[in-house]
């Protein structure tokens, strides 16, 4: 299989399938896809705290009692299919969107909380 074929296959995968692929690769090769964290000095830590965070991860922490409405809302904001959205909601806590702008994150959070879900911006 050529590199281009692999890239094309990845492009055609859903978010849920990509997540499963990453987990399988981590398990198979004994590695972690988490970004390495560098230890910074005290001066750098103080400067970083002063910066306002511009990108947020939208995390569904609990579906609440109206699971069907939450699944519909998740499909709307993520573009996932019914099966993928249901699996995501059933598996809460799960990240719905990574590196979302503050406005997008707040809009997604408001839409999901409107139907009874509990959502965090991290």
Curated annotation (Swiss-Prot):
InterPro entries: Ribosomal_bL12 (IPR000206), Ribosomal_bL12_C (IPR013823), Ribosomal_bL12_C/ClpS-like (IPR014719), Ribosomal_bL12_oligo (IPR008932), Ribosomal_bL12_oligo_N_sf (IPR036235). Pfam families: Ribosomal_L12, Ribosomal_L12_N. One of its GO terms (cellular component) is cytosolic large ribosomal subunit. CDD domains: Ribosomal_L7_L12 (cd00387). GO terms for biological process: translation. GO terms for molecular function: mRNA binding; structural constituent of ribosome. Keywords: Ribonucleoprotein, Ribosomal protein. SUPFAM superfamilies: ClpS-like, Ribosomal protein L7/12, oligomerisation (N-terminal) domain. It comes from the Bacteria. Homodimer. Part of the ribosomal stalk of the 50S ribosomal subunit. Forms a multimeric L10(L12)X complex, where L10 forms an elongated spine to which 2 to 4 L12 dimers bind in a sequential fashion. Binds GTP-bound translation factors. Forms part of the ribosomal stalk which helps the ribosome interact with GTP-bound translation factors. Is thus essential for accurate translation. Belongs to the bacterial ribosomal protein bL12 family. This is Large ribosomal subunit protein bL12. The lineage of its organism: Bacteria, Bacillati, Bacillota, Clostridia, Eubacteriales.
């Amino acid at each position: 299989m050529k590199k281009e074929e692999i890239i094309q296959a990845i492009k055609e995968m859903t978010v849920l399938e990509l997540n499963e692929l990453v987990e399988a690769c981590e398990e198979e090769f004994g590695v972690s896809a988490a970004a390495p964290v560098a230890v910074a000095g005290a001066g750098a830590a103080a400067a970083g705290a002063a910066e306002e965070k511009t990108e947020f991860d939208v995390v569904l922490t609990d579906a609440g009692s109206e699971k069907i409405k939450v699944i519909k809302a998740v499909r709307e904001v993520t573009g996932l299919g019914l099966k993928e959205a249901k699996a995501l909601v059933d598996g809460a806590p799960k990240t719905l969107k990574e590196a979302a702008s503050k406005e997008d994150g707040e809009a997604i959070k408001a839409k999901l909380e409107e139907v009874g879900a509990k959502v965090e911006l991290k």
